[in-house]
Amino acid sequence: MTSWNVRPATSAEIDRIAQVWFDGWHEAHAHLVPPDLTRMRTLESFAERLHPMLPDVRVVGASGAPVGFCALKDDELYQMFVSHEARGSGAAAALMADAEARLSAAGVTTAWLACAIGNDRAARFYEKSGWRRTATMTYHAETPTGVLPLDVWRYEKPLRA
């Protein structure tokens, strides 16, 4: 396994991060969510969504060429994707450890994340990382036309403050 340095994302990396997100999202979710949502999840839409959340995004990979990212929103591990070529390298585990440390440092005692129902690869990774599936819930996915309710698995993990 590679030793990964997790670092803040830069605005110059938005296009590459958006590509990682687009590729990973479509591979993991396109067959699990309504076709309308899949059509709205364009490369441009991911880049647009990244701009306001950039202060909460951390990446792994060479400067200018990240191969994975993680974004937080309040007490939620909001997004995490690793490029196909970096899977199995420890990149996701490094991003997860960093996310958990940041959430804990922010005073979060129980973190949560949403996982698409049927995204078994992600579910196995979360469970291996100590997260526990606690419920099926309705998640409000942001889209260009408003919010789309989706049933998802909710995972939680207690953190040390």
State what each model feature region is.
Residues M1-D15, W153, K157-A161:
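Conserved N-terminal entry element of GNAT/NAT acetyltransferase domains
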Residues A47-V59, E76:
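A short helix-loop-beta-strand connector motif used in the catalytic cores of GNAT acetyltransferases and
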Residues D56-G68:
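Conserved beta-hairpin
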Residues T109-A123, K128-R132, T136-A161:
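C-terminal "cap" of GNAT-fold acetyltransferases
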Residues G88-A101, R124, K128:
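Conserved acetyl-CoA-binding loop-helix of GNAT-fold acetyltransferases
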Residues K73-E85, A93, A114:
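Conserved acetyl-CoA binding element of GNAT-fold acetyltransferases
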